[in-house]
Curated annotation (Swiss-Prot):
It is linked to Perrault syndrome 2: An autosomal recessive, sex-influenced disorder characterized by sensorineural deafness in both males and females and ovarian dysgenesis in females. Affected females have primary amenorrhea, streak gonads, and infertility, whereas affected males show normal pubertal development and are fertile. It comes from Homo sapiens (Human). SUPFAM superfamilies: Class II aaRS ABD-related, Class II aaRS and biotin synthetases. GO terms for cellular component: cytosol; mitochondrial matrix; mitochondrion. L-histidine binds at residues 131-133, 158, 174, 178, 327, 331-332. Coiled coil: none annotated. This is Histidine--tRNA ligase, mitochondrial. Belongs to the class-II aminoacyl-tRNA synthetase family. Mitochondrial aminoacyl-tRNA synthetase that catalyzes the ATP-dependent ligation of histidine to the 3'-end of its cognate tRNA, via the formation of an aminoacyl-adenylate intermediate (His-AMP). The keyword Zinc does not apply. Homodimer. Changing residue 87 to K: In PRLTS2; uncertain significance.
Length: 506
């Protein structure tokens, strides 16, 4: 039977006859009633919309705009960080801002609840990336890469309570450096700590300390203290809060909320208060409980070797073996570390800024294998720089000192004291641009000279080239120093070379 659309011919004929039939009185009344109801609803909605208070324009909670002033400071920080990564031979890369939700789940322990999920898109469940490490591991497994040294700068998203006054956001930038591949023990790990020291020293944020531990030592400590293996990750997450909470509060969480026996928590407390240098590593080798745990001994052996390399790098004095460091993320398997500022540069009488850790990282040898169909592992170690917190510290320091920054890099301004000289200015600025010189001009046919000079002073442009009737007649260009207000006349054909000379000397 032939079809019209999806209905047989007879069905279409029946439907059309009903639609074309004149309406009865009851139907007409019902239609009129429905029309009145719809009109009333629409009127109510419009009225409610009109009575609605003015819309408040703002950024979403936990996010912020970056002004040109902020971007100048941020770019300087990122340039320093990236140049350090490149100095150590890293290659740049990027991954999508969102991943399949399955890629990210079960990688972050209790923090998995902080991921931002996206609405279903064509049958795929997606989440915004929580960090840059898991996407990197997925990339290695997907492309069967066995060895790589990479850096990655990008935004990540976490649905946590933001503390913007301390540089904590829901959307923030991370700068990661990672070494993937099978190498001799602790050599890549030592380089990561060296990079961390170079960056924090270069940023001149003040004195800092890098805490180190090993997840095998943490797990061994839990085992000898009597923590059930099923509670290892949950208790690890509690220990990770010791940088923000007092021991009594962490103990309360472990005992009351996570069901740990009080005597077990007390045994853990004896360990997590220990911190020191390589001598503490030696001391833990002799510990009557830890020395009986194979995992802990492996971790202590690697830390001893690590301190040997750190001494050769000249940074051992910046490193502290700290048994309270746990790093709550599930994917860490070996050495872990975290950098904290001991004091930030502040004026006398001011409280030091407390922003928590400014860099962290560790070894994650099993993460790539989670994505490989055959479970092939690619050992990895890396670090992440907390750009937002560092930026907050630098920003506060500049505010305290009253420092200002230039928002442009313009070197030369093209000006005129007379009307109808737009074409000449366009010729001059084109020559400057073509010579690689950063130049600007006002987008007006007849700008006032005073306005042009004031613009240079307010934006920090060092040089002005001036073209007018007299200069055009004599075949010269005036070059003016904004700082000294001195002017010299240079032949038209030599003015670019003269500017390049002055810029190279400044």
């Amino acid at each position: 039977m032939p079809l019209l659309g999806l209905l047989p011919r007879r069905a279409w004929a029946s439907l059309l006859s009903q639609l074309l039939r004149p309406p009865c009185a009851s139907c007409t009344g019902a239609v009129r009633c429905q029309s009145q109801v719809a009109e009333a609803v629409l009127t109510s909605q419009l009225k409610a919309h009109q009575e609605k208070p003015n819309f408040i324009i703002k950024t979403p909670k936990g996010t912020r705009d970056l002004s040109p002033q902020h971007m100048v400071v941020r770019e300087k920080i990122l340039d320093l960080v990236i140049s350090c990564f490149k100095r150590h031979g890293a290659k740049g890369m990027d991954t999508p801002a969102f991943e399949l939700k399955e890629t990210l789940t079960e990688k972050y322990g209790e923090d998995s609840g902080l991921m931002y999920d996206l609405k279903d898109q064509g049958g795929e469940l997606l989440s915004l990336r929580y960090d840059l490490t898991v996407p990197f591991a997925r990339y290695l497994a997907m492309n069967k890469v066995k060895k790589m040294k990479r850096y990655h700068v990008g935004k990540v998203w976490r649905r946590e309570s933001p503390t913007i006054v301390q540089g904590r956001y829901r959307e923030f930038c991370q700068c990661d450096f990672d070494i993937a591949g099978q190498f001799d023990p602790m050599i890549p790990d030592a380089e990561c700590l060296k990079i961390m020291c170079e960056i924090l020293s270069g940023l001149q944020l003040g004195d800092f300390l890098i805490k180190v531990n090993d997840r095998r030592i943490v797990d061994g400590m839990f085992a000898v203290c009597g923590v059930p293996e099923s509670k290892f990750r949950a208790i690890c997450s509690s220990i990770d809060k010791l940088d923000k909470m007092a021991w009594k509060d962490v103990r309360h969480e472990m005992v009351v909320k996570k069901g740990l026996a009080p005597e077990v928590a007390d045994r853990i407390g004896d360990y997590v208060q220990c911190h020191g240098g390589v001598s503490l590593v030696e001391q833990m080798f002799q510990d009557p409980r830890l020395s009986q745990n194979k995992q802990a001994l492996e971790g202590l052996g690697d830390l001893k070797l690590l301190f040997e390399y750190l001494t050769l790098f000249g940074i051992a004095d910046k490193i502290s073996f700290d048994l309270s460091l746990a790093r709550g993320l599930d994917y860490y398997t070996g050495v872990i570390y975290e950098a904290v500022l001991l004091q930030t540069p502040t004026q006398a009488g001011e409280e030091p800024l407390n922003v928590g850790s400014v860099a962290a990282g560790g070894r994650y040898d099993g993460l790539v294998g989670m994505f490989d169909p055959k479970g092939h592992k690619v050992p990895c170690v890396g670090l992440s720089i907390g750009v937002e917190r560092i930026f907050y510290i630098v920003e506060q320091r500049m505010k305290t000192k009253g420092e200002k920054v230039r928002t442009t890099e313009t070197q030369v301004f093209v000006a005129t004291p007379q009307k109808n000289f737009l074409q000449e200015r366009l010729k001059l600025i084109a020559e400057l641009w073509d010579s690689g010189i950063k130049a600007e001009m006002l987008y007006k046919n007849n700008p006032k000279l005073l306005t042009q000079l004031h613009y240079c002073e307010s934006t920090g442009i060092p040089l002005v080239v001036i073209i007018g009737e007299q200069e055009l007649k004599e075949g010269v260009i005036k070059i003016r120093s904004v700082a000294s207000r001195e002017e010299v006349a240079i032949k038209r054909e030599n003015f670019v070379a003269e500017i390049q000379k002055r810029l190279s000397e400044s």
